[in-house]
Amino acid sequence: MFATLALVFTALASNALTTPLPLVRRVPTGQVITQCTTPNTIALTFDDGPSEYTPQLLDLLSRYSARATFFVLGDAAAQNPGLLQRMRDEGHQVGAHTYDHVSLPSLGYDGIASQMTRLEEVIRPALGVAPAYMRPPYLETNELVLQVMRDLDYRVISASVDTKDYENQDADAIINTSFQLFLDQLDAGGNIVLAHDIHYWTVASLAERMLQEVNARGLIATTVGDCLGDGEIAWYH
């Protein structure tokens, strides 16, 4: 009998050692996050797409073996389900940027929630999942916005490097201003980078200059989830 019990306890102990631990999300919900926590990582993020320029950006990221995060909008996502699939298939993270790009603090609870759930209804058929990470339009939040994001289980991502690429859409300004902003804020310790894949000069010029600088500094260009220590399973609902 004692020999049998010993075998049972041995089997239970062995099973405990080999059974995977349940998923524990490391990143809190409903709190504004501006910085990566994994050493030597940088998160390039692109808002407002997908757009006609997104395939070119995906090609560029592939050439540099870099991963990025795309915070997408409702209509753009609805018109480009194949690009959403390509993003995920190539190791990038698809995040939520609301359906209509409206300032969330201007809305009540139900309006804020609707902006997120309507976008989920577009993304889920394309990917089979919906994002668990979001970026508020204009980086604007208030306590009600953050409460809704907690209730909907969203991680709220801001930025510590703002390229302001939307203000600098010509060949000179994108380098002299946006890329210089990138360098200055990188030097100051920023590592979550805000840009937009809906703008030609961002994709045609700025993105590659940023990737070259990332490589020169020995940094790893990865997704927001990864730079915060979250595995891919935690990027989605």
Swiss-Prot record:
Chain coiled-coil ranges: none
Glycan attachment sites: N176
Cofactor dependence: Co(2+)
Taxonomic superkingdom: Eukaryota
Catalytic activity: [(1->4)-N-acetyl-beta-D-glucosaminyl](n) + n H2O = chitosan + n acetate
Residues bound to Co(2+): D48, H97, H101
CDD domains from the UniProt entry: CE4_ClCDA_like
Regulation: Inhibited by metal chelator ethylenediaminetetraacetic acid (EDTA).
Pfam family, one: Polysacc_deac_1
Species whose genome carries this gene: Emericella nidulans (strain FGSC A4 / ATCC 38163 / CBS 112.46 / NRRL 194 / M139) (Aspergillus nidulans)
Task performed by this protein: Hydrolyzes the N-acetamido groups of N-acetyl-D-glucosamine polymers in chitin to form chitosan and acetate.
Protein name: Chitin deacetylase
Site label May prevent de-N-acetylated sugar residues from interacting with the active site, positions: K164
Domain NodB homology: 40-222
Lineage: Eukaryota, Fungi, Dikarya, Ascomycota, Pezizomycotina
